[in-house]
């Protein structure tokens, strides 16, 4: 470092700032010399004087700055500000103020997974397509006996998967450990294309999968995968419980029927480079039949930043179960979005509440199945328990023991009509969404492009009547 003709170098301000606040919220700053330090605790009680100060910048100099008669060596140049010629001031503490250096640099999180191409062929898709990760099928089959309502056969789920696995690349009795662990959004939509209101766009998605997945058994695989989804709803092993968000596709490496997919799991989709030199950047796109602008449907306007959601909509009519999936944008957060879903899918909500218990073979209700609240309250012989003793078994054991039989009665799972998860957000205001027809091989498919999508998947939220 060349200091020129300067004889004095100042590192650190030699002072500490202290902020005082009074009961009225007024703020004043004071500076004290380094030996005095700064208070660590609140002065007084309530909203009294609160002291807060940044540590002296000289505190972190040992190990970072080495001074000799001929030179000054700075080990870590991160956050060093040269305020004037020959005068170096350590302006930013590397530990406490690192956010000032990184807050404007968007982070990116990539994920990679190896999968069979049964349900996701990356060569037929473009970068930006949402990809879904599937849990192991034994997890769903193992939970079906306990979740299936009485009167329904939990083995139907096992049989549906067995029929689907017969068309798998690895076969039904696979011992290699490889499985189709990833599911493309287009394959999922194509498997239930008959349930969408936009019939033409949905049929275009199915035609795209049949034409570009390059497997003569693709049509059978679509039909059996749709039947597998129906069996999951019938046994109350809902699909969303065994699916998570993988991210937005950006690149892939494929050999035969085995592919390694890389996707954006966190951060802006456009921030990652693809392996296509012609299109180095990608935006998120979804099939037009599976896109839903919630604010537009509710006539709330479009001028605001929006969240991006993935929605599963269920219909629990016995033997005619329905599964639809949508990618929706809305300015509502996770809590308020549930009311919007309830309003938009009121038909599915009502039908699931009415028909969710169809086929239940439950025993006849016992005459004393209802809680005899009036009789208990009017009888002086029945024991009582004060609220302060509810955790004491000596008092609660003497109370009337009521164990209702809920078999065959509506419950939370029998009335479930939807589930959604927040995928991320569109930071631009207003958000840029464009619908146009794209060419996939020999098929034209209408899609909706979403720009500046920042991936940040959250947890599933279930909707019941």
From Swiss-Prot:
Domain of life where this protein originates: Viruses
Record's keyword terms, sorted: Capsid protein, Host nucleus, Virion
Record's GO cellular component terms: host cell nucleus; viral capsid
GO terms of molecular function: DNA binding
Principal location: virion
Keyword Ligase: no
GO biological process: viral capsid assembly
Family: Belongs to the herpesviridae TRX1 protein family.
Function comment: Structural component of the T=16 icosahedral capsid. The capsid is composed of pentamers and hexamers of major capsid protein/MCP, which are linked together by heterotrimers called triplexes. These triplexes are formed by a single molecule of triplex protein 1/TRX1 and two copies of triplex protein 2/TRX2. Additionally, TRX1 is required for efficient transport of TRX2 to the nucleus, which is the site of capsid assembly.
Official protein name in the record: Triplex capsid protein 1
Source species: Equine herpesvirus 1 (strain V592) (EHV-1)
């Amino acid at each position: 470092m060349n200091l020129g003709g300067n004889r004095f170098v100042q590192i650190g301000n030699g002072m500490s700032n202290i902020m005082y606040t009074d009961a009225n919220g007024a703020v004043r700053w004071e500076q004290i010399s380094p030996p005095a330090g700064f208070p660590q605790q609140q002065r007084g009680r309530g909203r009294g004087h609160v002291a807060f100060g940044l540590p002296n910048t000289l505190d972190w100099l040992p190990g970072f700055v080495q001074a000799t008669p001929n030179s000054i060596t700075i080990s870590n140049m991160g956050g060093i500000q040269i305020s004037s010629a020959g005068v170096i001031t350590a302006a930013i503490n590397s530990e406490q103020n690192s956010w000032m250096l990184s807050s404007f640099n968007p982070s990116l999180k990539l994920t990679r997974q190896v999968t069979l191409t049964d349900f996701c062929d990356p060569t037929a898709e473009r970068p930006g397509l949402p990809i879904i990760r599937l849990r192991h099928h034994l997890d769903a089959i193992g939970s079906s006996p306990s979740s299936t309502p009485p009167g329904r056969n939990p083995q139907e789920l096992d049989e549906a998967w067995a029929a689907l696995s017969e068309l798998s690349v690895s076969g039904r009795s696979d011992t290699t450990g490889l499985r189709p662990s990833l599911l493309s959004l287009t394959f999922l939509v194509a498997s239930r294309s008959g349930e969408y209101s936009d019939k033409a766009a949905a049929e275009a998605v199915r035609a795209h999968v049949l034409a570009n997945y390059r497997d003569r058994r693709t049509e059978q695989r679509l039909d059996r995968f749709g039947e597998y989804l129906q069996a999951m709803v019938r046994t109350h092993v809902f699909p969303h419980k065994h699916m998570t968000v993988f991210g937005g596709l950006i690149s892939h490496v494929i050999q035969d029927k085995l592919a390694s997919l890389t996707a954006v799991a966190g951060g802006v989709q456009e921030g990652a480079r693809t392996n296509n030199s012609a299109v180095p950047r990608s935006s998120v796109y979804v099939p037009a039949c599976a896109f839903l602008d919630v604010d537009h449907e509710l006539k709330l306007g479009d001028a605001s930043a929006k969240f991006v959601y993935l929605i599963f909509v269920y219909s629990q009519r016995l033997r005619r179960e329905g599964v639809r999936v949508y990618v929706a944008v809305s300015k509502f957060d996770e809590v308020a979005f549930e009311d919007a879903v309830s309003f938009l899918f009121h038909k599915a909500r009502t039908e699931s509440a009415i028909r969710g218990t169809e086929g239940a073979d439950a025993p006849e209700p016992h005459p004393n199945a209802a809680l005899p609240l009036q009789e208990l309250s009017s009888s002086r012989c029945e024991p009582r328990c004060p609220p302060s003793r509810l955790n004491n078994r000596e008092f609660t054991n003497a109370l009337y023991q009521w164990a209702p039989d809920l078999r065959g009665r509506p419950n939370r799972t029998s009335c479930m009509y939807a589930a959604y998860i927040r995928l991320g957000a569109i930071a631009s205001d207003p958000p840029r969404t464009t619908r146009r027809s794209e060419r996939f091989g020999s098929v034209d498919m209408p899609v909706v492009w979403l720009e500046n999508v920042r991936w940040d998947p959250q947890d599933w939220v279930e909707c019941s009547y």
